[in-house]
Amino acid sequence: MSEKTLATAVDKRRTFAIISHPDAGKTTITEQLLLFGGVVREAGTVKARKSGNFAKSDWMEIEQKRGISVTSSVMQFDYQGKRINILDTPGHEDFSEDTYRTLMAVDSAVMVIDSAKGIEPQTKKLFQICKMRGIPIFTFMNKLDRDGREPLDLIAELEDVLGIEGYPMNWPIGMGKELKGLYDRYHQRVALFRPEDDAHQYLPLNADGDLATANELEEDGLYQEARDNMLLIEEAGNQFDAAKIASGDQTPVFFGSALANFGVKTFLETYLEYAPQPASHQTPDGATVAPTDPEFSGFVFKIQANMNPNHRDRIAFVRICSGEFERGMDVIQERTGKKMRLSNVTEFMADTRENVETAVAGDIIGLYDTGNFQIGDAIYTGKTKIKFEKLPQFTPELFVRVAAKNVMKQKSFHKGINQLVQEGAVQLYTSYSTGDYILGAVGQLQFEVFQFRMQNEYNSEVIMEPMGKKTARWINPDQLDERMSSSRNLLVKDSQGAPLFLFENRFAERWFQDKYPDVELTAKL
């Protein structure tokens, strides 16, 4: 591919994550976007679990049973000349590490907010990661077909709680049962909620912001209120600033209802106007890898086992950072220095997949993995070694001892635990004294998902003995004396063989540090 052709292909890519608090409607809006992309004929309804009509992005059995997302899904489609890569992330806080890693693989984020609840805790946490990365954030105020908070309050909350300017691209004309439409000053039109037909979906506005043709809506107090609010904001509110959007200092705000498929298309088309093309990536030494660099490079941000339970496969998800991927190409794995051929590569629609012949910077590809990859691995071509910034890893707070219920099924137990731990959702530790397996997680739901998947995907029932909260601290192996371990600080090693103590509490940690003042303890963050 020539330099010019590569630049043109990269320019068409738009890669974003959808972030929200659980139940704000993140998966539903994903479904509607796929509908516009022609990928699905009808959007699944997350609520309708009994019907078997599950969300396309919630492909794992436990997600379909619970109606929640616990994994990051990758979906790709073309729309209006752009190749769109959507990463639908878990909203549940117990799976925030998976979400944080996903946010390292995108160029922008869509923040979905329940208009009845406003900004919720998980939304705030995920926003801070996006802010830290300086990526553009686009906001969709969802569930307008239900009664919610005042739009002015929601806009003000963005600035008060998140510290980001909000610029409303449209304004609701009523809400809940009284929802009439959206006053869309940006596109100079009113979008009607449930019009007679598609031909009468929009009413044009004139230069003064009034309806261009006579309509009974003009006499409606809700319309007049929306019009007045929008014009007031134009005079006294934040001014639209594309540069601030690009730097993540201003967020365009769209109102709508994902469930009613109202306002979503307008959002998508406007998003494509302002969303950035693939960005450059930094290396630990401060160098920049540009997306149009001719040499291929990328990094593994996620590993997922058993996307196809019949084949017990593993997929390593790679964000391409530069150049072009071609099927059958040889790459170097930075961590090991090994050369490997990328022959079996796929692209995704949640659990369905297609073989991919070529892909460019900004795309997400899946490599069939036999155990060669770890999260954070870089792969590249060319003579210059490429390494990317380290992906975030959380220090677990909850721990359980885990063992196979049936000692005759040790083989499937070990295979399952190794594969699921490599996904990064739980951490594995081994007791120095007994050899017991110990799992660490950020939240209880991770253990429940682990137990469910071990039984359903590996036919291995497990016994889990809660150990409660612990404080994990790593120790330099050169300073380690196994006699330092006691009933209050269990000595274990992590999956890489590094020693650490699991302290009962902070008091036990302080007692240890008083007893061994020269020993350095560290928390992996």
From Swiss-Prot:
Keywords: Cytoplasm, GTP-binding, Nucleotide-binding, Protein biosynthesis. It comes from the Bacteria. Its main location: cytoplasm. The keyword Cytoplasm applies. GO terms for cellular component: cytosol. GO terms for molecular function: GTP binding; GTPase activity; translation release factor activity, codon nonspecific; translation release factor activity, codon specific. GTP binds at residues 20-27, 88-92, 142-145. Residues 11-279 form the tr-type G domain. GO terms for biological process: regulation of translational termination. It is found in: Cytoplasm. CDD domains: RF3, RF3_II, RF3_III. Gene3D superfamilies: P-loop containing nucleotide triphosphate hydrolases, Peptide chain release factor 3, domain III, Translation factors. It holds the Pfam family GTP_EFTU. Transmembrane segments: none annotated. InterPro entries: EF-G-like_DII, EFG_III/V, G_TR_CS, P-loop_NTPase, PrfC, RF3_C, RF3_dom_3_sf, RF3_GTP-bd. Belongs to the TRAFAC class translation factor GTPase superfamily. Classic translation factor GTPase family. PrfC subfamily. Increases the formation of ribosomal termination complexes and stimulates activities of RF-1 and RF-2. It binds guanine nucleotides and has strong preference for UGA stop codons. It may interact directly with the ribosome. The stimulation of RF-1 and RF-2 is significantly reduced by GTP and GDP, but not by GMP. This is Peptide chain release factor 3. It comes from Levilactobacillus brevis (strain ATCC 367 / BCRC 12310 / CIP 105137 / JCM 1170 / LMG 11437 / NCIMB 947 / NCTC 947) (Lactobacillus brevis). The lineage of its organism: Bacteria, Bacillati, Bacillota, Bacilli, Lactobacillales. The gene is prfC.
